[in-house]
Amino acid sequence: MDNIILRCDNNINGIFTAIYDAFVYKNQMQKENHEVYRDNISIEIGIGGNYTLFSKMIDIETDEVKVQKTILTIQKKLGFKIYETVFDALCHYSDNRATIVLGFLVRAFKVGQRIMEYMTDKYVMEVFELSRKVNKEADKIRGFIRFSDNGNYLLAHFEPKCDMIPVVMWHFVDRYPGENFVIYDDRRRYAVVHPRLKECFYINESEFCLLYTSDAADDKA
């Protein structure tokens, strides 16, 4: 079988899309070659990676339908607890996290929830280790994040090692359901916005700067 590298956007939805496509290519390769899959599909996160000799590089476009199908399949076949472990592992900063999770899911879909008994497998062990480290940092962050009153909303800045916004934001949604608040990740340059009593949404750096500038202008008016 040829080696395939799937290159995806550097965010959780980009990775879930790549995982979906990885299984499509895996099944196609097995059907065409009648061979056992040998972990020869990897996922590269972000732009600017190095091409590998004798490997096929495929750029993956983030697809919300594929994202939801992947999430629902993991939850249905493996349970919500294992889904949370996978999600947390994907929020780690390791460049290999997507490939590690792919290897884990290939094995998990074969044995179901019994995958937790296979801790000697390197992919299983690494997924749980990544998840553990993310949760350790999340526990610290929940305790030290502080909001400042920005007039129209509460604002918090932080610079975590791991991608913490998707992990910790629900803690603050539960804590401040009636508040407008924004949490901005200075390292990854994006934010989550929580309008009071409404659903959260993400904004990028330019959108955050526009929000911040607009709010500052309102204060001066």
Residue ranges and their predicted role:
Residues I47, F54-A138:
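Charged, alpha-helical interface segments at or near domain boundaries
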